[in-house]
């Protein structure tokens, strides 16, 4: 009813304004403008997943990475979580590698209730990851991160000391510290600090008048 006559009416009543082209080297679905509407996110991701699966089922589609940024947000929707689980189980059949991205592992606390089937399913996706890449963690996250990922004491102590672009790589039972380098073209695409580092002073507050409070 919401899709036909309610607040979501008109969004899915006609052809898409964007063509899903699986021949492109990379496709990104940006949900940043709808993240406050959980129902809309769920519907959009369901449609996008149907697009994606049609491309993955193409025998001539080659191999692909499927990247889930802010993964906890998608995992909070049961249907999407089950679809992600299917992609994990059928990864070899689809010719894909899956990547989950979290700010911190405690984000999983947003997925279902403690002890629920949803929480267990989300945790199993993490447990089935052969490669874990962990960037610097704050001290209040160290215990839960170490427990969830099975880190050694040395690895746990290393995490708060990592610098920008440095990460602990856990591959099976081996670990490495890597310094990641971005190509300028990659930095232009993925730099999320642009507004904080801009030299544009047009919107900066002027200096306080003499005697003003700060």
Model-flagged regions — what are they?
Residues 1-96, 100, 158, 167-172:
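P-loop NTPase motor domains
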Residues 186-190:
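C-terminal alpha-helical "lid" subdomain
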Residues 78, 85-183:
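Conserved ATP-driven motor cores of ASCE-family P-loop NTPases powering translocation/secretion/packaging/pilus
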Residues 1, 8, 12, 105, ...:
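Generic structural signal of hydrophobic/aromatic residues within well-ordered alpha-helices
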Residues 16, 165-169, 196, 213-214:
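Compositionally biased, intrinsically disordered low-complexity regions
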Residues 44-46, 148-150, 183-185, 195-199:
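Short intrinsically disordered coil segments
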Residues 192-214:
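Acidic, low-complexity intrinsically disordered tails
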């Amino acid at each position: 009813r919401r899709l036909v006559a309610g607040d979501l009416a008109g969004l899915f009543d006609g052809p898409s304004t964007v063509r899903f082209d699986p021949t492109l080297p990379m496709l990104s679905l940006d949900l940043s403008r709808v993240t406050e509407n959980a129902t809309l996110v769920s519907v959009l991701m369901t449609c996008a997943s149907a697009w994606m699966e049609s491309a993955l089922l193409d025998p001539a589609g080659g191999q692909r990475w499927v990247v889930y940024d802010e993964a906890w947000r998608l995992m909070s929707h049961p249907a999407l979580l089950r679809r992600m689980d299917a992609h994990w189980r059928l990864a070899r059949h689809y010719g894909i590698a899956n990547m989950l991205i979290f700010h911190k592992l405690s984000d999983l606390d947003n997925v279902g209730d403690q002890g629920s089937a949803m929480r267990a399913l989300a945790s199993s996706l993490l447990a089935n990851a052969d490669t874990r890449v962990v960037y610097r963690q704050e001290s209040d996250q160290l215990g839960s991160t170490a427990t969830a990922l099975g880190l050694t004491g040395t690895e746990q102590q290393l995490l708060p000391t990592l610098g920008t672009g440095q990460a602990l790589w856990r591959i099976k039972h081996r670990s490495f510290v890597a310094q990641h380098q971005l190509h300028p073209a990659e930095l232009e695409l993925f730099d999320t600090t642009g507004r904080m580092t801009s030299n544009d002073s047009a919107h900066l507050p002027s200096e306080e008048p003499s005697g003003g409070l700060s």
